[in-house]
A protein has these predicted regions:
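Accessory terminal regions of nucleic-acid processing enzymes
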Residues: 1-143
Length: 143
């Protein structure tokens, strides 16, 4: 996984003629309740993200399926749109890479309507997680 992902990142950097900044978690805000973990960020200047990168390194049969469809698999749309929301960018590149097959590189545009509908679901999920953490913390304190 990680070795192939490094190869994919290098391929992308050459194909797009850009530097790819590796990073860990990126937080939506200082509260740090919502984050994403991009496989790379493309910066116009330090701290000025212009695009993100999501890399998938599927098995050969899955890569062939992706290539034949020529589209981003629907299961990755929430991840890509959510990452654009968190990083506040208008595009995110999806790269599906297998070392023995043609890469699939698609630029996904930000969908503000999708993000608007996603925010309440995300906030509800985060609230439920926080409630669960609080309950566990109180149980441990009581024990």
């Amino acid at each position: 996984g990680n070795i192939i992902e490094e190869d994919a990142r290098s391929w992308y950097s050459m194909a797009r003629d850009c530097d790819v900044e590796e990073c860990g978690l990126v937080y939506l805000d200082s509260i740090k309740r919502v984050s994403c973990s991009p496989d790379g960020l493309i910066l116009q200047a330090p701290e000025d993200v212009i695009c993100g990168l999501e890399i998938k390194c599927p098995l050969a049969h899955t890569q062939v399926k992706y290539l034949l469809s020529g589209k981003v698999p629907t299961q990755y749309i929430p991840q890509l749109q959510g990452s654009m929301y968190v990083c506040d960018v208008d595009t995110w590149d999806f790269l599906s890479y297998h070392p023995d097959l043609e890469p699939l590189l698609i630029t996904v545009e930000r969908d503000d309507e999708w993000i608007k509908n996603f925010k309440p679901v995300l906030n509800s999920f985060v609230d439920r997680v926080q409630d669960g953490i609080s309950k566990l913390t109180h149980k441990q304190e009581a024990a």
